[in-house]
UniProtKB/Swiss-Prot annotation:
Protein name: Cell pattern formation-associated protein STUA
Compartments reported by the entry: Nucleus
Compositionally biased region (Basic and acidic residues): 385-395
Protein family: Belongs to the EFG1/PHD1/stuA family.
Amino acid sequence: MNQGHPQPDMYYSPHYSTPQYGYGYSTNGAPTTAVSTPMPAPQNVLPVPSALSNQGAMQQPGYSNSSNNGAFDTTGQHNPPGMKPRVTATLWEDEGSLCFQVEARGICVARREDNHMINGTKLLNVAGMTRGRRDGILKSEKVRHVVKIGPMHLKGVWIPYDRALDFANKEKITELLFPLFVHNIGALLYHPSNSNRTSQVMAAAERRKHEGLGGQRPAAPNALPSIGQHHPMMPGLPTGGYVPQSLANGPQSLASTPQPLTNGSQPPMPNGGGMLKRGREEEEDLHRPVSNGHDPMSNMHAMSNGYPQQPPLANVHQPPMQNGGDMLKRGRDEDDEVHRSAHTAHDTMNNMPGSMPGLSNAYAQPLPNVHHQPLANGDGGMLKRGRDEDDDVHRSSPNGHDSAGNFEVKRRKTITSNDSMVSPGGFYTLHNGYGQPGVMNGMSPYKRRDDEAETPRPGPNVHDHLNNFDLKRHKTMETSVPAPQYDAMNRPHSSIGTSPTYAPAPVYDNLARPASTVAASPSYPSAPVYDTGARPPSAISAPRRQQSFG
C-alpha cells in the first residue's frame, strides 16, 4: 500500500512519456498486465479538481489488486491501469448541446452534456453485439431518443446514463469506455496542454445557448432615431451643414430635430408635419399632385438653400398652426370641407401673421412642389384618426391612379368654372404658376354622399366610360315602361271557364238519341249474305280440268 503512491509520479509524470499510452487490453476487454495497486482517479493526472483527487486517494485501498481478485469497476469513475483518459468535445448544433466523445475499438460513443444521455447504439456496437439483438434491446427501453439525421457518431438510439452504465457492466466494457461514465467529465477537458482548445469549445457552446440574444445590439445612448428614417415622406439624413439640436441643447432635444444653419425664419414643412399619420401614406404620398412632374419624394420640402428640410415636432413656426389650428380635428367637418378652397391651399405661406415677414420672397419657388390641399389646411395633422373613408377620397391624386374612387374625382375636377386645363402629364395647373390643389372650386365636398344620393353628372369627355355607363343606366331606368301589375283579388272574371269564343260542347243522351247513323248508315250498303245451301251450282265446284279438256 505504501508503494502504491509513488507510482503516479512514475507513470503520470508531467512529461507523459509515450510508452505509457499503450492500451494493454485483449479483445474481450480484460487487462493483460497485473498491477498490484491501481492508479488513482484521473483527477491526479489532471490537477485542476482537487476535491476529486482526494476522493480518488481515499478509494485506493478498496480497489487494490483488481486483476488478481477478478474485481470489476462498475461505477466507471476510475481509470484502468496504464490508461490515459481521452475525451473530445464537439458542439451538436441540431440539439444545441455539447457532446463528449470517447473512442473504443474504433467506435465513437457520445454523451450529451445537458441530459447526460448516451448513444446506446454505438455503446452496444463496442460490445460486439449483433444488429438484431442490439435493436431488440434498444426497442424495449422505455426512455429513448431516436436520432436519424446528423453526423454518423450521433445517429442511433440515445438512452439514459444509468441504463447505459448497466449495459456496459453486463457486457464488461465499462473500463474500455473510460472516461465516458465519469460524473465530472467536463473537468477532463480543462488541462493545461489543451486549455486553448477547451476555451474555444466552451465558448462555442455558450454562444449556442445564447444565440437568441446574440443578434440584438443595444443602441447608443446618444443616438436618437431620425424622423426621416421612419417616415416615408421625409428625405434621407442630411450630409452636411447640420447641428443636431438633440446633442447641442441637452434635455430639450425631444421637441426638435436637426435644423439647417440658416436664418431663424426658415419655414418647416408647410403641410403640418404629418409625422404620425396612418400607414397608408406610402401609397398616398406617391400620387400627390406635383406641378413640375418631378419625383414627389424629392419635392416634398423646400430646397432653396440646398438643404433637404426636416420637419420639427414642436416648432412654433408651422404654417398649419397659424392658418387655423385645425391639426387635431377629425377632418369630416362639413364646414371645413366646404371652405377648403384653392385660395387656402396656395396662400398658406402668404396669409400667415407678421411673425414671418420674409417668407413670400424667400420661398416663393418651392411652393408649387409642396402645397396640396389635404396637408396645407392641416387636414393631415399630427394626431390623425384611424381610417376615414371620406378623407381618403379627398386625399386622392387628380390623375386617377391610386384608389377606386379617383375616377369620379377626376371626372368632377374637369368640370370647373375657371379656365384651368389638364396638362399632358395628368397634373392640373393654373396660369399663375402655382400647382393646383387637391380639391378645386368645382368639386363638391360631399363626394361620397353624392355618389349615394345624386344622379351621376355627365362629363364633357366622351371617352369617360364610367360616366357614360352611369348616364346610360340612369336614362334606361327613367324611360323604361313599368311592368303591368296584376291584382289577383280585383281582376275581372276569368275567361278561361266561360270563353265566348268557344261553343259549349254538345251533350249526348243515350236514351233519347235518334237512330244513329253508325248503326245504319245510308252511305254504306249492307253486305250481301251468301247462302251456301241455296246457291246455284257455280263453276267453282266443277273441275277445271274437265272444262279445259272437254
